[in-house]
Amino acid sequence: MMDGTNFDDALTGEQKIRNFNINFGPQHPAAHGVLRLVLELDGEIVERCDPHIGLLHRGTEKLMESRTYLQNLPYFDRLDYVAPMNQEHAWCLAIEKLTGTVVPRRGSLIRVLYCEIGRILNHLLNITTQAMDVGALTPPLWGFEEREKLMVFYERACGARLHAAYFRPGGVHQDLPPDLLDDIEAWSHEFPSVMDDIDGLLTENRIFKQRNCDIGVVTEEEILEWGYSGVMVRGSGLAWDLRRAQPYECYDEFDFQIPVGKNGDCYDRYLVRMQEMRESLKIIQQAIVKLRETKGDVLARGKLTPPSRADMKTSMEALIHHFKLYTEGFHVPAGEVYAAVEAPKGEFGVFLKSDGTNRPYRAKIRAPGYLHLQSMDHVAKGHQLADVAAIIGTMDVVFGEIDR
């Protein structure tokens, strides 16, 4: 019988259209590295968003079990390679907690200084590439110019622009060169005008606001459910910052504000990052003042750290200690510890389990971007395809730390 009764759409008069699946990335310029999203689209609306990770997986946590504690330090530079020193910081704090090492004050201040430089490095890249993802081409050019100056400060402190390995258990590897503090201070007085320029281009820009306001809204309940940290939390109005909530190093001596948003959308997260850069500048300027007053060693001399060059030329024991330290490495007392820092992307934590040998028994890395990306399906559902790029941009994902 051919009267059409066995065709549903003939009865309803509407045709059922199958949703179609597309790949977003890994070659997409807005995918920030090797992100692959499988998107199910209903026309232009995202119905489902499935992140496929692991394209940059290098087995870091497993590799760390067969290296000494010091040899593991450079792996942390390669996680979030946008602001490398912040990650080393967490590893050093974990080792210092287990061994009970006290960092000398000057070393502690240098760490704070470079962590804040790292925060500005990260936020500059994030804000400017976020602008590029939604169609503004000028900010990235300005942002990279400023990042270049900061990279030079990295290089002058430790000889490397990117993979620094500058923080060591017990402090930092070497003291800062004499003129470096003056140059950082001079830069910190010039930088606000650059931020004002970026501010003028983006903050009240109609197109930028249309692309970011009410996109990727995150509520306070969702923050707790998905385990967000960092700007994703502060953009929604919760003033949670580990530098203030669980002060580590000497952050409790510094005077700075914690910027918070109120709508929890992409635009608020952009505003929070802009303001955080200004707060980081305050911390940098305070750290420079404190460093000028504080003299002394930058590394806690002891079993964890190498003897000075002068000692090695005169003392046989110092030479033996140096040789043992760089071949066998130092032994860490058995136990387990969790150390976390407020990295630019969120709470970067290290869970370290030691069995008393010179190698970690297990090290678990808590990457903030991993938890943010995992909620992509929840956040992007119901948005348009073009908004996916804006959401990923403000989540601030870097695949070194997500795939690790």
From Swiss-Prot:
Catalyzed chemical reaction(s): a quinone + NADH + 5 H(+)(in) = a quinol + NAD(+) + 4 H(+)(out)
Q: Does the keyword NAD apply?
A: yes
**Can you name one GO molecular function term for this protein?**
quinone binding
Q: Which InterPro entries match?
A: NADH_Q_OxRdtase_suD, NADH_UbQ_OxRdtase_49kDa_CS, NDH1_su_D/H, NiFe-Hase_large
Q: Please, which domain of life does this record's source organism belong to? A: Bacteria
Record keywords? Cell inner membrane, Cell membrane, Membrane, NAD, Quinone, Translocase, Transport, Ubiquinone
> Has the keyword Repeat been applied to this entry?
no
Q: A single GO CC term, please?
A: plasma membrane
Q: How does it sit in the membrane?
A: Peripheral membrane protein
- Chief subcellular location: membrane
Q: What is its EC number?
A: 7.1.1.-
Q: SUPFAM superfamilies, per this entry?
A: HydB/Nqo4-like
Quote the subcellular location field of this record: Cell inner membrane
Q: Which family does it belong to?
A: Belongs to the complex I 49 kDa subunit family.
Q: What does this protein do?
A: NDH-1 shuttles electrons from NADH, via FMN and iron-sulfur (Fe-S) centers, to quinones in the respiratory chain. The immediate electron acceptor for the enzyme in this species is believed to be ubiquinone. Couples the redox reaction to proton translocation (for every two electrons transferred, four hydrogen ions are translocated across the cytoplasmic membrane), and thus conserves the redox energy in a proton gradient.
Binding partners and assembly: NDH-1 is composed of 14 different subunits. Subunits NuoB, C, D, E, F, and G constitute the peripheral sector of the complex.
Q: What is this protein called?
A: NADH-quinone oxidoreductase subunit D
